[in-house]
Amino acid sequence: MSKKKNASSASTKVVETGVAIDYRVNLKCKNAKQKELVKSIYENDIIFVEGVFGVGKTFVINSVALEMLKEPNNGIDKIILIVPTCSCSATMELGHLPGSLDEKLYNFALNEMDSLRKILKKSGNIEPDKIIDSLVKNEKIDVKPISFLRGASIENAFICVSEAEEFTKEDLFLIMSRFESGKMVISGDPLQASRNQVRNGNSGLLHAMEKLTDINGVGTVKFTEDDIVRNDILYDIYKKWNS
């Protein structure tokens, strides 16, 4: 692990169709649980991450995704973002947004894109917006709705499934069934689930955390309120709110 982390601080290039995209990632884990998450991602193929808000789930996952994308010979050719508003049940929502299909999908992934930009900025990259735009233009970052996954086979990709608390068992099973090679990291906070279908006992994330822990190549990481790093006040709010 230490060799991989040291390598992440050096600037390397992602090359697609003759275009070199130069950037650096400098991830510094803030606690033992974040280090556990990084280790699990490198050691497993499919990783489930459960945790409350403010623990850095998305930041760590996306940092490793960018890091692995630029590392040579590790089988990762692109980052694919799958967000809950692109679920089968939300397909109709796409039609109500202006613009092309790609523009609509990227509107749903604004939080993920913002996270990627922040990572690049904190890592010392001068123009993170241009880097992200180049990665998107060269199809190194892509957003896919679940409805487009049926019959597909995803290989050599780092698949980030964020806000997975909104996915039902059926949604999550469909997503996992499309995985062929690379990494798939599925993360969420069940306490923030808003869909009634999920809240009424059909949470795909909770089902996976319970049923799939003993499979070789599958990793599970669970954060608690003690792992909150965003702001100390969030810990106090969480404790009071859930007491």
What are these regions (language model features)?
Residues 2-4, 13-25, 32-161, 165-243:
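Conserved helicase motor core of SF1/SF2 NTP-dependent helicases
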Residues 9-11:
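Detector for small/aliphatic-rich hydrophobic stretches
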